[in-house]
Amino acid sequence: MVLVPVLPERNRAKAADLHAPDDRLGETVGLAQAIDLDVRDAQVVSLATVRPGALFGSGKIEEIETSVAVHEIGIVIVDHALTPIQQRNLEVAWKTKVLDRTGLILEIFGRRAQTREGRLQVELAHLTYQRGRLVRSWTHLERQRGGFGFLGGPGESQIETDRRIINDRIDKIKRELETVVRTRSLHRAGRRKVPYPVVALVGYTNAGKSTLFNALTGAGVHAEDQVFATLDPTMREIRLSSGRRIILSDTVGFISNLPTTLVAAFRATLEEVINA
């Protein structure tokens, strides 16, 4: 199930997404299908007010709970950033897994990353996201333990241990990515010595950038009718019809409301666009 919340007008200036609700709905359904989910129900939900504890009002939560049961929904995707408490409360109310926009895009990126750099970037974004949800995960485990008696929930000390492990891993990945940044900087410095301009193909995800790149270069870069098919930049030297030579770069596609954790994680990749 895909839900697209439309915030009250007074909240829209602060909202991450100001796009038309139907456009958001179509895009989010496409994102869900990108990880092979069978979308059985999709709807735009207008909110009279934003509930801090669950985003939706109690009446709408009950209505969706019924729909989840009728359609036998295994996961509900909410096209909005959810706080850990909101996510937990919705999972309890609907008795199913809930994923917000950030979690959905992270899942797609995790499946698409091919190179070591790409996997590091995705892992960094995922760990940053996961770190803020340690308490939510803990309360979820505690709830399961109380209901079934076979799953021991960790105490606060376990949460702190998990947080330390995640922080250590984040620091290690950042150090590794700094090496990537330095390497890319050296490569760019080398390219500046070559009298060929760098041209980056920039656009929305699944707009056809990789297909165009292949047509111009014959590179055989993976191109498919799916979002985020390309996560790692590829460069090729080509000769234009005018005879001029350029270095053409295929890049990761953009999408509305790209989570800030992903923007930060893909710094090295995005720098190729900035420096084109």
Outline where the language-model segments fall:
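Conserved G1/Walker A P-loop phosphate-binding module
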Residues: 10, 140-276
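Short alpha-helix plus adjacent loop in nuclease-associated cores
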Residues: 103-122
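A charged, well-structured terminal subsegment
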Residues: 124, 128-142
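Short, conserved glycine- and acidic-residue-centered signature motifs
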Residues: 21-24, 57, 120, 224, ...
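A residue-level signal for conserved active-site and pocket-lining positions in enzyme catalytic cores
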Residues: 28, 127, 166
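N-terminal accessory targeting/assembly segments
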Residues: 1-107
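Conserved phosphate/pyrophosphate-binding and hydrolysis machinery centered on Walker-type P-loop NTPases
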Residues: 18-21, 54-58, 80-81, 113, ...
